[in-house]
A protein has these predicted regions:
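Glycoside hydrolase catalytic-domain context in secreted enzymes
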Residues: 1-473, 481-491, 495, 537-942
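Terminal connector regions
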Residues: 466-537
Length: 942
């Protein structure tokens, strides 16, 4: 039926309306098509219903309701901050009395940083404020100043991912009225038991922290010094606060180590400093209980606090330089940016403690006190502990050593302590000749004690496998080894005490050195009279795999790495004059390689089986029925599964695989790049590392996994196990520590907890992804020993010590090859040497030029973290049809993906009787269909 227009006005009106409808039709129909192409992403984002009904689930939540789970999350968050916060200074400041009245200073006191930005950003709408947490624990808080700050127009400007505007970055301190308004200064007389000053520093994905020139006002920079130094407004605040208060406490709300040396003396000295990191949504209650004294702090620093960043070896080559003969190719194509890890293995405490020993025993011109504020592993308590090494069992045949340590609480408060064990391998003439570096101390084990009452003791037993102390020799043995010589195991409270103990033992029988620090009785030493070589890998002999990642491979040994043989002569300098040779540029082109991967792919046999994925539950990975299943998958489904693996895996109807919903992290379930449901925001990984509590990490992994069950989430892009190479790295809140052993052990425990509920974790980012600037394709160069002993070490540990099912690669190049297409890294080391059979996924992909599909699949990659882009899917589909060898590799990837997701919560709700997917049409799909139908109908009538 057509509408009859009876007047020119009506005709004009309806003509205009027709144009509008035609325009809407042109816009909405393609939009609808695109929406259905990306239905998995939209389903994941728009599906906010909790999975309450868990009947017939392979993995069920341990909690009868989501409300009960959230209650536990709050309790666990408090427990984490109670165990993790680090007391750095306490001059008769803490704990406060039960009836204390305090005043909170700084704009940050009403606007704390709870988590990092970017992938670690989680909805914190229900966050607990510092004022509320203190008051709920019986401490009265000055309401007048709190209200003043809340009404202040000063705002802390933060940085945007991949587009940091350092000129706008502010500290946002508001000192103008707080010491001139009478009603405020009068309130200080009433709430004067303690002034609590909050110092905050943001960090997150896509940017590093400015080392100078930020916070630009009227053409001038207020932030002239580094962002991690105390700024003028903050120092002015502290100085004025001290006039009104006899007791001042600073809370460090930062994930990176700051230069707080000014707070330790003279006009800016405060009475107490407590590092609280990023406490997450509910963690502040734990902090308040420490301040009140209900909980005794037991956290130990996961990084080193230094005075001057220029003394930090890694800082000399940080941020990314451009090859001298090239210009910048763009923020998302950093092919001409590079960075050289010239500091080698000497990251954080490994440098400072080694330099300290050299200054004592070898006359190196180095002052520890002028460089280090607080050593790695440092942390005070309200009580005192004595640790005594009371015995050791050394088993030469088994290559093990067990230490027995008595820990006694000799103070007046109950509390926990952490036993830290550091090893030293003798630095020999062989090492000097073959360019093997050995730090003076390396964390090799740690254990947290039980809660000890005053005068109570605990015997802690620490078992050490000597192979874990191995070094890598890239020049002579070209594998791991333990050389002939002396070995030391030091029981200590921090890294500095550990080396002092060892020096004490070395010098106790000499008259030439009057070293009075340390306790030689807390060192166990032994001698190896034969060199031990470790060449046996899982399927491949261990040998050099990263010769081409060493810049000297291309520059004829032009670069000298930092060496303890002469720290003064080899201390790093900014390496800005490197030219890109023609050979190097040819590598950067990322040309497609032959599909001849070094790892074995079984021949696939064509079948007509109707086998479904669930039929293979509990079948061995190499069961021949897997070939039957894989050949039931169409080329289109294979390409979709592997090429569009962003925030979930694609469903496959033919084998009844429902696909999966995967989420970002690592502070909890944080949805994805497009939105989605956020879970509890737990304290940051940097803070959790200070707990030194493996059981706590296991509990955290399980708690997040329980929430994932309710959210219908299976994959979790966590934990972050990159190294805090530099305090100014923007993403330090997502990474545990500057120490690889601590990072690997804590990550392993988190993974173990999550695995119990069928959650597939993706520890990230493999590898050398230790800064954010120029991260998209930057070439990172390092020598083999450095890669293996520092940056690859956490991944090695999690593969060996946890049931990890996934690993995420990085944006950067490892040497000149993108991490996800580096065959030496993925195929040779991860797959063959370490025996990893899980899923290897890229970081987020969106058609970036250097992300070569062919080379990545050939290297052992399985999944592209692409969501809306069909670039990788289409390229995979094209190559499947034209290249049989490539298809074999794709089938191998599908095998790994499906095997791991079969043994996960993705299969919740399915059984052997399931003959088809539980497809239900989403509300958004119904809405689009109705809207499109109306458009067609209206166009027909007009």
């Amino acid at each position: 039926m057509k509408i009859n227009f009876k007047s020119k006005g009506m005709k004009y009106l309806f003509s205009s309306m027709s144009l509008v409808w035609i325009t809407l039709f042109v816009v909405l129909i393609p939009t609808s098509i695109n929406a259905f192409k990306n239905e998995r992403i939209l389903d994941n984002v728009l599906d906010n219903e909790l999975q309450e009904n868990q009947d017939n689930f392979l993995y069920k939540s341990d909690y009868s309701s989501y409300e009960n789970l959230k209650k536990y999350h709050k309790e666990l968050s408090e427990e984490i901050t109670q165990e993790s916060a680090v007391l750095l200074k306490n001059d008769s400041c803490l704990p406060l009395k039960n009836t204390a009245k305090v005043t909170l200073f700084s704009r940050n006191s009403v606007d704390l940083i709870y988590s990092g930005t970017g992938s670690n950003s989680i909805n914190i709408a229900k966050k607990i404020t510092l004022k509320d947490s203190l008051e709920s624990n019986g401490i009265s808080v000055n309401p007048y100043l709190n209200d003043y700050y809340k009404s202040s127009n000063k705002e802390r400007i933060e940085l945007n991912i991949d587009n940091p505007n350092y000129d706008a970055l502010t500290i946002a301190e508001d000192n103008e009225g707080i010491f001139t308004k009478g009603y405020l200064t009068n309130s200080y007389l009433k709430y004067n038991d303690c002034a609590i000053i909050v110092i905050s520093r943001i960090g997150g994905e896509g940017y590093d922290l400015p080392t100078s020139n930020f916070d630009k006002v009227d053409g001038k920079y207020k932030g002239e010094n580094g962002y991690l130094t105390l700024q003028k407004d903050e120092l002015d605040l502290i100085k004025k606060v001290k006039r009104y208060f006899s007791k001042t406490l600073v809370l460090l709300n930062t994930s990176s180590a700051m230069d707080v040396s000014l707070l330790l003396k003279d006009e800016y000295e405060v009475n107490g400093i407590l590092w609280i990191g990023y406490p997450g949504e509910y963690g502040l209650n734990g902090i308040s209980k420490i301040i009140k004294g209900d909980i005794n702090p037991s956290g130990k620093l996961p990084h080193t606090y230094i005075k001057d960043i220029s003394s930090y070896p890694a800082h000399q080559n940080f941020g990314g330089f451009i090859f001298k003969n090239k210009t910048n190719a763009g923020e998302y194509d950093c092919r001409y940016n590079y960075l050289i890890y010239q500091e080698g293995i000497y990251v954080g405490y490994r440098y400072y403690e080694t330099a300290y020993e050299s200054s004592i025993l070898n006359s190196l011109n180095f002052s520890y006190e002028d460089n280090v504020i607080y050593p790695f592993g440092y942390g005070l308590s309200y009580t005192s502990f004595i640790k005594d090494l009371i015995g050791a069992d050394f088993n030469k045949d088994k290559n093990t050593c067990s230490l027995y340590i008595k820990v006694k609480n000799v103070g007046n408060y109950e509390g926990k302590d952490v036993v830290q064990i550091y090893n030293q391998n003798e630095y020999t003439s062989f090492d000097k000749e073959n360019l093997v570096e050995k730090a003076s101390v390396n964390l090799i084990s740690f254990k947290k004690t039980k809660l000890l009452k005053p005068d109570e003791s605990d015997i802690v037993v620490v078992d050490i496998n000597l192979e874990d102390m191995k070094n890598y020799d890239a020049n002579y043995f070209k594998t791991y080894f333990l050389g002939k010589g002396n070995y030391y195991l030091s029981v200590a409270s921090n890294a500095h005490e550990a080396i002092q103990n060892i020096i004490s033992l070395k010098t106790k029988d000499t008259s030439s050195t009057s070293f009075t620090e340390g306790n030689y009785k807390n060192v166990y030493s032994f001698n190896l009279d034969k060199t031990q070589i470790f060449k046996e890998g899982n399927k491949r002999e261990i040998t050099n795999e990263f010769d081409e990642v060493n810049i000297n491979h291309y520059l004829n040994d032009k670069i000298t790495y930092l060496s303890r043989n002469d720290f003064s002569l080899t201390f790093p300098k900014p390496l800005k004059d490197i030219e890109l040779t023609s050979v190097m540029e040819n590598e950067l082109l990322d040309k497609s390689e032959d599909n001849s991967s070094s790892f074995v792919v079984d021949n696939q046999v064509k079948t007509n089986s109707n086998i479904k994925l669930f039929d293979l539950l509990n079948k061995d990975y190499n069961d021949p029925k897997w070939n039957n299943l894989l050949n039931n998958i169409s080329n289109e489904d294979l390409a979709d599964l592997i090429g569009k693996g962003g925030f979930g895996s694609s469903k496959i109807n033919s084998i009844v695989y429902p696909g999966s919903k995967d989420s970002d992290g690592p502070s909890g379930i944080s949805g994805n790049a497009y939105g989605g449901k956020s879970g509890t925001c737990f304290p940051s990984q940097s803070l959790i590392a200070a707990s030194r509590n493996e059981d706590l990490l296991n509990k955290l992994g399980l708690a997040i996994a329980n929430e994932a069950i309710y959210f219908k989430t299976t994959g979790w892009y966590a934990p972050g196990i990159n190294i805090q190479r530099n305090p100014y790295s923007g993403r330090n809140n997502e990474y545990y520590s500057e120490d690889p052993y601590l990072s690997g052990i804590l990550g392993s425990n988190l993974i173990q907890g999550a695995y119990k509920k069928g959650i597939i974790t993706y520890p990230k980012h493999l590898v050398l992804n230790d800064q954010e600037m120029h991260r998209h394709g930057i070439s990172i160069f390092a020598n083999e020993q450095t890669i293996r002993e520092i940056y690859l070490k956490p991944f090695e540990i999690i593969i060996k010590k946890s049931p990890v099912q996934g690993i995420m690669t990085s944006f950067n190049r490892v040497g000149l090859k993108w991490s996800a297409s580096n065959k030496n890294l993925l195929a040779n080391v991860l797959r063959e040497e370490l025996g990893f059979e899980g899923v290897i996924i890229t970081d987020y992909t969106s058609g970036y030029k250097w992300m070569n599909v062919n080379n990545s699949i050939n290297a052992g990659l399985n999944l592209f973290l692409a969501s809306s882009s069909d670039t990788y899917k289409n390229e995979i589909l094209s190559k499947i049809k034209s290249d049989d060898n490539f298809k074999k590799l794709v089938l191998d990837s599908a095998h790994k993906i499906l095997y791991n997701y079969l043994h996960s919560s993705a299969m919740n709700g399915y059984t052997k009787e399931s003959k088809k997917l539980n497809n239900s049409i989403s509300t958004w799909k119904i809405s689009i269909i109705i809207l499109d139908a109306l458009q067609v109908l209206l166009l027909y009538h007009f």
